[in-house]
């Protein structure tokens, strides 16, 4: 900011002096050696801008402006690079809450699916056992009918263990 203010002040001083000069004045005053003027600071050391080539002034101002623009661009690039690096470094904190939410939702879905699976397995097993009970009941009824219609059991008073 200070460099920009310094340049704008320098430009203002140079342009004020350049407006007051006429072309004939610039051509007639040979006391300034244009080859010695290399920077804007050299221009500020002069008492007047009489005899200084306007193209030289313009070139020096453009060089300094380009220098400051380059510095500003470098600063901007550095700040953008730092910002990009900061954004690329993803902290673990950003993922903990979504991870917990995902785990809770996944476990809820799993438990719900498992409950449905158990219920279906229970119903299937219940149907199988009901068929088994029905078949055993029919077998029992058939055996009881045969026993009722069959020969009467002998009234053997001997104990079963005596046959051994």
UniProtKB/Swiss-Prot annotation:
Its main location: mitochondrion. It is found in: Mitochondrion inner membrane. Residues 121-149 form a coiled coil. Keywords: Chaperone, Coiled coil, Membrane, Mitochondrion, Mitochondrion inner membrane, Transit peptide, Transmembrane, Transmembrane helix. It is a single-pass membrane protein. Residues 29-97 are mitochondrial matrix. Residues 1-28 form a transit peptide. GO terms for biological process: mitochondrial proton-transporting ATP synthase complex assembly. Residues 119-164 are mitochondrial intermembrane. It comes from the Eukaryota. Belongs to the INA17 family. Component of the INA complex (INAC) that promotes the biogenesis of mitochondrial F(1)F(0)-ATP synthase. INAC facilitates the assembly of the peripheral stalk and promotes the assembly of the catalytic F(1)-domain with the membrane-embedded F(0)-domain. Component of the inner membrane assembly (INA) complex, composed of INA17 and INA22. Interacts with a subset of F(1)F(0)-ATP synthase subunits of the F(1)-domain and the peripheral stalk. This is Inner membrane assembly complex subunit 17.
